[in-house]
């Protein structure tokens, strides 16, 4: 432990042992050893007899002096690191490191050596290897030193990052299955800035620092994991990490990430939960500005747009825009703003396919989505307005009007075959549920049994739907409503999808008192586990080996 002292010409325990072994007068030898190796300052030496009279052990005295000197030395090292020209101060620190590194394994002096290394932008490679080879030293060194180790050792960096990524995914999935059922406090309620203060994002930000190479490694981990698991929460983390570095004004990274300004603009939209005309044009400008030969940037842009918070904002804006078009008596194809929202939505939803195929082209917009599906959706809005107006008429003027109960066959076909149509359709369902529009909900529920990629049974949609259904609490006392919701929709996926059962249970925990006892008993029986369960969509794990794979290159280009 004290071997390093000999290199500095300082006596240690072995020297004392040898002295006592060879001496003829041990007491004199001890006194001489104390004199030679004790505190040499006259002002302190004179205090020793006084302390002896008070029974203060010499060890306690020397330890106190040592601690004080070490603190002063740490302060001085930090001062050297911030004074004068860079070249001069780094030279001083390198000299100090050379003299002190032999003491790095001494617990009492280790903080000084670590402090010196922390302030060096480039620690000598030989010393980095010695630190990396010793687990105790590696754990003790500052993150500034670890960055220098990680940038040339992706496997080790992957080992550090992997638990954080697993933790992040678990936190997101736990939020989706939160026992709280509320329209005001749901998965999308926290603001972007609040989310970026989360433990995982802050730790990753600290680990990356201003190191472009490490930032690029994290992006490669996220892309690979997204490709392997299809878990969209990795897309969220990709955007949050970039904006966390933006908050800290880390220009070294933000200035070289081609997605920075696009993500910054989109972040403002997510904060407002709406894409206004001005920001829509800014986003369009970024997409149109992708030059020939730089199409790979679309890969990262699509991943950022695949973030559930971005999809949520774009979908809400689309539904709101459709309602405005009804009032303006305009068709979807006549609205450039709506077409841009659809373009962004299509790019986000096509992220996985783009990364998988490595074909970096914007997905082609289905013409029928704009010319047939969206007008049909607008006709549903008109049906609601017509029915509501009729209900408000005086009895003598009211015509016998019944609310439409069927869906056009083409509409359900769109939900089954086109992802874009399905996403917009599901957000329209969320909209009418939030408006407490029971008639419209019951009309649309049968169309949700079979949707593109079972999107109607995804955790995000069911999380939002169950929260909105809390507004219709009184309707759960009605047999027809419960049958349509549970038997006609939710239970059609049970027990095939375990996640659906969990969301149904979340709903019943809050509303079971409103449900008729006979119906509640039937639901309990239907929800009993059978042992034949698929993995929920939130069951994805972070594959360990992925983070240890060497990248094909290391630079801040999207791919």
Segment roles from a protein language model:
Residues 1-559:
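Very long, low-complexity or repeat-rich scaffold/adaptor subunits
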């Amino acid at each position: 432990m004290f071997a390093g002292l000999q290199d500095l010409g300082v006596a240690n325990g072995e020297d004392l042992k040898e002295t006592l072994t060879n001496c003829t007068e041990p007491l004199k030898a001890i006194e001489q050893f104390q004199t030679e190796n004790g505190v040499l300052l006259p002002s302190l030496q004179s205090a020793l007899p006084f302390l002896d009279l008070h029974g203060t052990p010499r060890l306690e005295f020397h330890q106190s002096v040592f601690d004080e000197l070490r603190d002063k030395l740490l302060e001085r090292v930090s001062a050297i690191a911030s004074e004068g020209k860079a070249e001069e101060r780094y030279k001083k620190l390198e000299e100090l490191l050379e003299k002190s590194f032999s003491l790095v394994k001494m617990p009492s002096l280790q903080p000084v050596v670590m402090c010196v290394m922390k302030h060096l932008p480039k620690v000598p490679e030989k010393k980095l290897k010695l630190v990396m080879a010793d687990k105790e030293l590696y754990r003790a060194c500052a993150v500034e030193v670890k960055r220098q180790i990680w940038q040339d050792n992706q496997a080790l960096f992957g080992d550090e990052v992997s638990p954080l990524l697993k933790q992040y995914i678990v936190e997101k999935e736990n939020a989706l299955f939160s026992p709280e059922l509320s329209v005001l406090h749901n998965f999308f309620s926290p603001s972007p800035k609040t989310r970026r203060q989360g433990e995982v994002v802050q730790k990753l930000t600290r680990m990356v620092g201003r190191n472009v190479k490490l930032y690029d490694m994290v992006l490669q981990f996220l892309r690979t994991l997204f490709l392997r698991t299809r878990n969209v929460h990795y897309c969220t983390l990709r955007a949050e990490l970039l904006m966390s570095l933006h908050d800290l004004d880390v220009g070294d990274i933000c200035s070289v990430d081609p997605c920075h300004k696009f993500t910054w603009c989109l972040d403002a939209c997510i904060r407002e939960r709406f894409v206004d005309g001005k920001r829509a044009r800014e986003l369009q400008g970024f997409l149109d500005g992708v030059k020939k030969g730089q199409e790979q940037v679309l890969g990262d842009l699509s991943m950022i747009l695949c973030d559930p918070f971005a999809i949520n904002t774009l979908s809400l804006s689309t539904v709101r825009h459709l309602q405005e078009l009804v009032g303006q008596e305009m068709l979807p194809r006549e609205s450039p703003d709506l077409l841009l929202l659809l373009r962004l939505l299509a790019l986000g939803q096509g992220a996985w396919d783009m990364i998988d195929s490595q074909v970096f082209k914007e997905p082609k917009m289905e013409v029928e989505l704009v010319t047939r599906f969206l007008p049909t959706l607008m006709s549903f809005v008109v049906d609601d307005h017509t029915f509501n107006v009729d209900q408000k008429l005086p009895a003598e003027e009211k015509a016998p009007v019944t609310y439409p109960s069927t869906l056009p066959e083409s509409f359900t076909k769109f939900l089954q075959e086109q992802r874009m149509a399905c996403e917009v359709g599901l957000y329209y369902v969320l909209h009418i549920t939030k408006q407490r529009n029971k008639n419209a909900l019951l009309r649309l529920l049968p169309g949700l049994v079979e949707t593109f990629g079972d999107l109607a049974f995804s955790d995000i949609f069911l999380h939002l739907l169950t929260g909105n259904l809390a507004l219709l609490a009184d309707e759960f006392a009605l047999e027809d409503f419960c049958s349509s919701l549970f038997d006609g929709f939710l239970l059609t996926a049970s027990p095939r999808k375990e996640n659906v059962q969990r969301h149904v249970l979340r709903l019943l925990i809050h509303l079971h008192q409103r449900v008729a006892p006979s119906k509640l008993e039937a639901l309990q029986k239907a929800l009993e586990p059978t042992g034949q369960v698929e993995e929920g969509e939130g069951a994805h794990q972070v594959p360990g080996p992925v983070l240890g794979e060497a990248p094909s290159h290391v630079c801040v280009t999207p791919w």
